[in-house]
Amino acid sequence: MKLFLVRHGETDANRVLGHSVEGPMHNEPVIFKSGDDTNIPLNIVGRGQAEHAGGELPGVIDELYASPLLRVKETAEIIAGTKNIDPKNIQFRAELIEYHQGSLEGLTASEQKERMGVDSRGSGLLCNYNYTPWGGDNWETIYSRLSSFFDELKKHGHDKNIVCITSGGVIRMAYKIFLKDKSPSITKHIMIKNGSIHEFVID
């Protein structure tokens, strides 16, 4: 099975920050956009990135999955269009939804520190797989649900090209799953830009 993980195209939130936001596992401002209140669409650059990604993917896509978040859904629909895939054949899966920080959602690292009274990055708190911010996810849950999803794909995905459109934090977690290493440093230098494609060959 060849598994292609694609990060959604750029949104205005990504552009305003001036860099890709990948989450608490590397040295960037901690701002997540995954909840309903921050479920924002692609901008014109992001739509172009999705179109480009579609052109870079294999000519034959056997199965196309996506997170139901708006920016991911739009990316998936654009990619489907480049491959003449009926958008109705996109399979939306909750397992591919980005990590949600709950009460910390949308805050920079300094704003989180002010709210929590502790440096969420410097303390390693948000890298703790069992820490759950109020109303949010924890990394152990993400790891578990994503592992189960990949196991499901492996059962029927032999000799298939499978594409999953998702978010940066999920792709970073996928690397940890396939490398069998949960340490923050394992993905520190992996770039996961908007519209980027990450290919895994799975026996």
Q: PLM features: residue spans?
A:
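Active-site-proximal alpha-helix that buttresses catalytic centers in soluble enzyme cores
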Residues: 2-85, 115
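Generic beta-sheet signal
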Residues: 3, 158-169
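Domain-level recognition of soluble alpha/beta enzyme cores
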Residues: 30, 140, 181-203
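Short glycine/proline- and acidic residue-enriched helix-loop micro-motifs
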Residues: 32-38, 120-141
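Glycine-rich phosphate-binding loop signature in dinucleotide/nucleotide-binding domains
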Residues: 57-60, 153-160
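Short glycine-rich phosphate-binding loop at a beta-alpha junction
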Residues: 61-68, 91, 161-165
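A short, structured active-site edge motif that brings together acidic residues
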Residues: 68, 86-105
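A polyampholytic, Gly/Pro-enriched intrinsically disordered region
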Residues: 108-121
